[in-house]
Amino acid sequence: MNVQMAFNLFLVDHESYCSEQSIVYYRFNVQKFVDFLSDQLGSAPDLIECDVISRELVLAYLSQLRGTGCKNTSINTYFRAAKVFLNYCINEGYCSSDVLRKVKFLKKDNAPVLPLTQWEVDEIDGCFSEKTECGLRNLCIIHLMLDAGFRLGDVVSLTFKGINFKLNYLTIKGKGDKFRTVFLCPKLKRMLYHYLIKYRAYTPEDDFPVFAQVGTTEPITETSVKMVFARLKKRSGIDRLHPHLLRHTFATSFIIGGGNLEFLRMMLGHSDYATTKMYLHLAQQSKMLHSDVYRLDPVFFQAGY
């Protein structure tokens, strides 16, 4: 079995049960590994047999990724796709099980995650105007992450039907095609409603994407949102700014405010507590440093009926 054919079969196999987002991830990142094999062995992928892939080649690929200067977390993200592909090849009998022997992911980065402060969020908000389509759209995107804990992919896939303005909640199809419900706070509700009414010909029952490229009906992509953040990082002067930091800030602020860990797990869409518990540490760290972490709307912490 040659590498190109194995790659094609791998994608067909995973398309039967993986989300579209996961397939895009595998297609891009496994292709990087396939290109590496082609460069190292001096042949096209359809001329390379899977059984020539060695443990040494796999370690060389990991070494090349480390040489890019990316953080360990990013390197592990790229390398994970190659490992999944190789495990598929091993299970199908295309290559030896020895190729992944003692090949481990890199240790997690030790750099602390510092949630955004109230002052920093004010700086971010000040970079946009609610009076323009672009500004209002971007504010909605930012506060979906900051006030609802959305991932970047959640923002892109949110539809008209996923917003319930009457009952104040959002429904999103997240990782693994799992649906979850998140509370819609007043500030975010107002911004979303104005954006949809003014710029998106909003009808509650339709399944159209909420966000579009400015002046068009073309849906935004994850790449276009990343470009917004790249510009925002320069303009705001917040060097550590990236989309997932806003989700971290939401979760940390929820814990600091006295939020329930089980509620947080459900809102973030985590399958277990292992990842969610990280925010207990971040919350304690922020308290210890007397950090003025961005505060969520008080409605998140109302008690009683």
Model-derived features: positions:
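Conserved catalytic core of the tyrosine transesterase superfamily
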Residues: 1-305
